[in-house]
A protein has these predicted regions:
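Glycine-rich phosphate-binding loops of nucleotide-dependent enzymes
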Residues: 1-257
């Protein structure tokens, strides 16, 4: 059974057609890239999947169940997590606490337990801290656990946001331009990290990214959008060699590394 099935999805903002007739099926443990120019509708699709925007028409099924009309928090509980173009962190909190907060909606103790500091509270807090540190280690951030998030370099903030998404224990991870603002060394590390996340956590990944070197190296399939419609889909090599796609949506004379 596919993990995500989107059929004939459309979204209108008044008279503006942001997404038209978008269809996509994701199988378990795939890494699929969603590419296209700014304003093509990529992030709008993420917002439709996660319930931030209501759908104008079409269907979205996650693990065989319709998620249309569900509030974002319920969609998150089902197992869909995402990152954002503009990093969303608790900037005044520590790196560790940024991850710990994601676990707290699923804690196994009550208010009285925390007030009295009983054994169940202590054990659960220790488990949350240990799990958070494991995720920070995966992101190469364990040595910065006590730093304030605002003081992290930009690339580290990106990785912290991914750690927060993973703390929700998702089955589907939506990454919105994770390489934005990273230097070439950080981008290379990110490519390996995305593969590791898929393999280690057994997660399906849908990725929006403008850096073609990233999507060509890490994605198994690519879907190209323009003006809210799919204009090409296929293997990275097929997209790489599609002259129309390169000229119309990546710019004339672009060479994909």
């Amino acid at each position: 059974m596919p993990i995500l099935e989107i059929s004939d999805l459309s979204k209108n903002f008044g008279g503006l057609k942001a997404v038209t007739g978008f269809s996509l099926t994701l199988e378990e443990n795939e890494i699929v890239g969603l590419i296209g120019p700014n304003g093509a509708g990529k992030t709008t699709i993420f917002n439709l999947i996660t319930g931030i925007f209501p759908v104008s028409s079409g269907s979205i099924k996650f693990m065989g169940k319709s998620i249309l009309g569900m509030p974002p928090y319920k969609i998150t509980q089902l197992g869909i997590a995402r990152t954002f173009q503009n990093i969303r962190l608790f900037k005044k909190c520590t790196v560790l606490d940024n991850v710990r907060t994601v676990f707290h909606p699923r804690i196994n103790y009550g208010l009285l337990d925390s007030f009295l500091r009983i054994a169940r509270y202590s054990a659960e807090e220790e488990r949350i801290t240990a799990r958070s540190l494991e995720l920070l280690k995966t992101m190469n951030l364990a040595d910065r656990a006590e730093m304030t998030a605002a003081n992290l370099p930009y690339g580290d903030q990106r990785r912290l946001e991914i750690a927060r998404a993973l703390a929700g224990e998702p089955k589907l991870l939506l990454l919105d331009e994770p390489a934005a603002g990273m230097n070439p060394s950080e981008v290379g590390t990110l490519v390996e990290l995305i593969r590791f996340i898929r393999d280690h956590f057994k997660i399906t990944i849908l990725l929006i990214e403008h850096q073609m070197g990233v999507v060509m190296n890490v994605c198994e399939r690519l879907v190209v959008l323009d003006f809210g419609e799919i204009i090409a889909a296929g293997l990275p090599e097929e997209i790489r060699n599609n002259k129309k796609v390169l000229e119309a949506y990546l710019g004339k004379g672009v060479t994909v590394a």
